Amino acid sequence: MADALIDSQVPAKSGGAGMLKKSFPGLSFLDNLSEMTMLRQIGLLVGLAASVAIGFAVVLWSQQPDYKPLYGSLNGVDANRVVEALTAADIPYKVEPNSGALLVKADDLGRARMKVASAGVAPTDNNVGFEILDKEQALGTSQFMEATNYRRGLEGELARTVSSLNNVKAARVHLAIPKSSVFVRDDRKPSASVLVELYPGRSLEPSQVMAIVNLVATSVPELDKSQVTVVDQKGNLLSDQQELSELTMAGKQFDFTRRMEGLLTQRVHNILQPVLGNGRYKAEVSADVDFSAVESTSEMYNPDQPALRSEQRNNEERQNSSGPQGVPGALSNQPPGPASAPQQATASAPADYVAPGQPLKDANGQTIIDPKTGKPELAPYPTDKRDQTTRNYELDRSISYTKQQQGRLRRLSVAVVLDDQMKVDAKTGEVSHQPWSADELARFTRLVQDSVGYDASRGDSVSVINAPFAPAQAEEIDSIPFYSQPWFWDIVKQVLGVLFILVLVFGVLRPVLSNITGGGKGKSLAGGGGRDGDLALGESGLEGSLADDRVSIGGPSSILLPSPTEGYDAQLNAIKNLVAQDPGRVAQVVKEWINADE
């Protein structure tokens, strides 16, 4: 027995309405929509509108181009000139509201940079230089304002110069220049402070800090280097003079040592590379350099070559007389007493002895008269003589002053390792590795010693050994994965957009519309007003998304018809109950079937 969907509230003959619904399928959707409550109608319309809006947004997102920053920030950039340059070149752009970055399309990034650069737009700092002096000054400008403008201009120019150094992103310079005074007690020296903002992950070398200090100190009159302070953006003091000098000296010594080692290593390469080939040996040189400053003074004497430097002679002769002696005066100028001749000569004195100061007599006993003075000659008094000679001799002396130069090579160590020599068999062409002989290693050792200036007295060491090298493994350059390519993400966006639209259509819109239109079909098929309305269950009861649902037949006492999957017995019992409750309508349905068959 065929199954049927019957609506007991529809008149038995209503073929006109059934034909109208069949001719216009959308009327069933509107009919079912009108039978819903107002809240469900609003919810359905809002859901449909939201689905369409989301689908439209996904399509726009998939078609949206990739934007990249032209400037990470508009700080220090004339935004008006940048926008004018991009607009004139017809390059679309947008500004990121959170970071303030200026974004352009990835395809237009290179062209945008060229256009902006050709327009003369470049990032600049906010420092004001000497261009502040180009402005017209008011008639009543005071000397203080003029001095302040000059100081601001000098600070700006110094900040720009410091900012041009590597690793320095921006800089600010503050100058404290006191007013000059004619009084010495009021004289004050100027000072300066420099704040440097470094790039992330960068730092300044001690030599660069000293360069900044010297640059600022020589740009301001009477500014001493000790009065310049350099600080970074983290508050670290960079201009500690003592530490800077020590670090600078240590850095110079380290660089000098590395340069010396590099020069000696290059000499070894120049000797071994033509003989062994590239990559067949490894050489390293270690130099012990003495940077101590030594000053010495030596004085040497040669006693074999004396020289008379000075001579002093002193001859003294003294005679005893009875003349005036003592302190000059009345007491010392008294005349001498009368001379008294001895009454009897001593036995020891000779016969012709004349006492000192007595007149001399000749052999005849006559007094000898001095012809010049006409006075008698007197016997001389005793005389004391002394001769003293002082001679100073100068020895041969040599004084030498020696100052050893810093950077003296104290010791040198050279290490060379040789790979096995390669032998090619002339017959088979096979390559074999053989170690070097002792004589060949000794020959290479002598070559290396001569190339680096080997000095045994200095304690230099040169080691040349033979060891097989590990086989070199070629490093494969990893290709860029496809998922990192820009085109891949463009395709992914397109595919995701299409998938989202398909899910939205077939997963949301279609089930909703099927539920609505399916309910209308059930009611139109259950209506008894026409041939098309009274269809058998076998023709349409299994169609649509409601084929497995239980269908309600409206009437005074509603009867639920079983679904086709519940079996033939359940359907038969439901039809029997329907015939028992409303036999007239069942008879009308049978008549419609008969008329349809004829």
UniProtKB/Swiss-Prot annotation:
It is found in: Cell inner membrane; Bacterial flagellum basal body. The basal body constitutes a major portion of the flagellar organelle and consists of four rings (L,P,S, and M) mounted on a central rod. The M ring is integral to the inner membrane of the cell and may be connected to the flagellar rod via the S ring. The S (supramembrane ring) lies just distal to the M ring. The L and P rings lie in the outer membrane and the periplasmic space, respectively. The chain crosses the membrane at residues 42-62, 488-508. It comes from the Bacteria. Residues 340-351 have a biased composition (Low complexity). Keywords: Bacterial flagellum, Cell inner membrane, Cell membrane, Membrane, Transmembrane, Transmembrane helix. This is Flagellar M-ring protein. One of its GO terms (biological process) is bacterial-type flagellum-dependent cell motility. Its main location: membrane. Residues 296-392 are annotated as: Disordered. One of its GO terms (molecular function) is cytoskeletal motor activity. Residues 310-319, 383-392 have a biased composition (Basic and acidic residues). It is a multi-pass membrane protein. The M ring may be actively involved in energy transduction. The gene is fliF. GO terms for cellular component: bacterial-type flagellum basal body, MS ring; plasma membrane. It comes from Pseudomonas aeruginosa (strain ATCC 15692 / DSM 22644 / CIP 104116 / JCM 14847 / LMG 12228 / 1C / PRS 101 / PAO1). Belongs to the FliF family.
